[in-house]
């Protein structure tokens, strides 16, 4: 009989299994905490959407739409796409559910997987995990600064400090057309290949985002948007920077920065960490004042970001840090017999009701095997219960770090464990 074939995860799609998954959850939750504190409500988005949403919203000239989307026909022969980013889906939901007709700004946050067909490398996956926020309906530099400060606080709250914020302005409808003409004039004078020239015709900023060395060298002297801002766009950008200064959020103005999505206007930013090498981005975002109208809604402004959970985990590792505990439990029960097991099951549930993570040695491991399992669990304490303890009405509490053990009354064990752990 032939051996059954085995399966593995698709290329570029990571599994997060214990104990590493504990850090993943801690990073994801840490990045969302600052948004909750600022009044951002949670939104849960579909994993797939109508392909046209991303083609229109993200931009057909982007690598995301032209090269990286997972697009397929469903059984009704409708073209659908696994979501490559979150903003377009949020805007669609805001329009569909009329959230834009209530109190403004609409503040929403989300977390989950997104999908792009990229060349897999460290922290750059085909299923990427992101945390994002969107603030829709108010064109206010103070709101731009708040969104940026939320991301900064999320990273710092995890203990990350080796990152920097790069920021620029991509202008507004007043100055962008003139800048576009000047940039195209510069680009069309270069010996560009046919595909790059096509990009320059659709959205010339995309050429400045080209990662190829020869293209970057040719465009080194390209005109910069920051030198062509309208008075209104410049005043907006200056005010954003003033708010960031007041919030003590450090930044570096990068006039050559171009984000990978076409909908950005005015304030645009990226968080980078040099410990990650060439793929240094850990998150970014910006303002997208024309996107809602482009998707059929009101002409309302918006600003948001997407932060990479996978890449933040790697950035912490580059600094020799971890987020949260990788221990799967705080207390491990070691029953010496079936009667002891029945009693520890009850005690475990009582401790869990107090918010304490508890596991037990199930099966017939024997005391040696059970204690070995306790050590491997990462727990701080072991509850040891045998026939003599049952007769005495006590439970043994063992400190797994020091080996010290004490006996307490069965009636007091929950309170005593809570006191030791500070729960």
UniProtKB/Swiss-Prot annotation:
Gene3D superfamilies linked to this entry:
Anticodon-binding domain (3.40.50.800), Bira Bifunctional Protein, Domain 2 (3.30.930.10)
The chemistry this enzyme catalyses reads: tRNA(His) + L-histidine + ATP = L-histidyl-tRNA(His) + AMP + diphosphate + H(+)
The subcellular location is: Cytoplasm
Alphabetized UniProt keyword annotations: Aminoacyl-tRNA synthetase, ATP-binding, Cytoplasm, Ligase, Nucleotide-binding, Protein biosynthesis
The UniProt entry's GO biological process terms, in alphabetical order, are: histidyl-tRNA aminoacylation
| GO MF annotations in UniProt | ATP binding; histidine-tRNA ligase activity
- Pfam families membership: HGTP_anticodon (PF03129), tRNA-synt_His (PF13393)
Task: Quote the CDD domains the UniProt record gives.
Answer: HisRS-like_core, HisRS_anticodon
InterPro entries given in the database record: aa-tRNA-synth_II, aa-tRNA-synth_II/BPL/LPL, Anticodon-bd, Anticodon-bd_dom_sf, His-tRNA-ligase, HisRS-like_core, HisRS/HisZ, HisRS_anticodon
Give EC number(s), comma-separated. 6.1.1.21
Disulfide bond entries? none
Query: What's in the GO CC field?
Result: cytoplasm
Q: Which HAMAP family does the record match to this protein?
A: His_tRNA_synth
Concerning its family, UniProt says:
Belongs to the class-II aminoacyl-tRNA synthetase family.
Q: Describe its assembly.
A: Homodimer.
What is the protein's given name? Histidine--tRNA ligase
Q: Which organism is it from?
A: Rhodococcus jostii (strain RHA1)
Instruction: State which gene encodes it.
Output: hisS
């Amino acid at each position: 009989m032939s051996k059954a074939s085995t399966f593995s995860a698709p290329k570029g799609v990571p599994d997060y299994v214990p104990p590493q998954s504990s850090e993943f959850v801690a990073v994801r939750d840490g990045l969302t905490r600052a948004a909750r504190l600022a009044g951002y409500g949670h939104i849960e988005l579909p994993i797939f959407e109508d392909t046209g949403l991303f083609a229109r919203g993200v931009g057909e000239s982007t690598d995301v739409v032209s090269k990286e989307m997972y697009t397929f026909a469903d059984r009704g022969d409708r073209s659908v796409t696994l979501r490559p980013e979150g903003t377009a889906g949020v805007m669609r939901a805001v329009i569909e559910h009329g959230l834009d007709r209530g109190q403004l700004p609409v503040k929403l946050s989300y977390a989950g997987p997104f999908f792009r067909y990229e060349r897999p490398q460290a922290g750059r996956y085909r299923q990427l995990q992101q945390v994002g926020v969107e603030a829709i309906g108010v064109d206010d530099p103070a709101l731009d600064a708040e969104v940026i400060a939320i991301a900064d606080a999320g990273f710092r709250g995890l203990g990350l400090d080796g990152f920097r914020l790069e920021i620029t302005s991509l202008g507004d409808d007043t100055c962008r057309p003139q800048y576009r003409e000047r940039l195209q004039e510069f680009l069309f004078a270069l010996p560009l290949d046919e595909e790059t020239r096509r990009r320059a015709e659709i959205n010339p900023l995309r050429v400045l985002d080209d990662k190829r060395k020869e293209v970057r060298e040719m465009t080194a002297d390209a005109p910069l948007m920051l030198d062509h801002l309208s008075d209104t766009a410049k005043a907006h950008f200056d005010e954003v920077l003033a708010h960031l200064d007041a919030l003590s959020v450090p930044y570096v103005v990068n006039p050559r920065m171009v984000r990978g999505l076409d909908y950005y206007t005015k304030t645009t930013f990226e968080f980078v960490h040099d410990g990650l090498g060439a793929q240094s981005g850990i998150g970014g975002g910006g303002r997208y004042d024309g996107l809602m109208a482009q998707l059929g809604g009101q002409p309302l402004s918006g600003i948001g970001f997407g932060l990479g959970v996978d890449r933040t985990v790697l950035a912490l590792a580059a600094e020799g840090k971890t987020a949260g505990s990788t221990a799967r439990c705080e207390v491990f029960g070691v029953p010496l017999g079936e009667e002891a097991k029945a009693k520890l099951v009850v005690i475990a549930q009582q401790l869990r009701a107090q918010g304490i993570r508890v596991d037990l040695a199930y099966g017939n491991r024997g005391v040696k095997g059970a204690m070995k399992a306790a050590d491997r669990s990462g727990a701080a304490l072991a509850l040891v219960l045998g026939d003599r303890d049952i007769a005495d009405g006590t439970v043994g509490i063992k400190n797994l770090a020091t080996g010290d053990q004490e006996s307490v009354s069965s009636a007091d064990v929950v309170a005593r464990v809570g006191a030791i752990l500070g729960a």
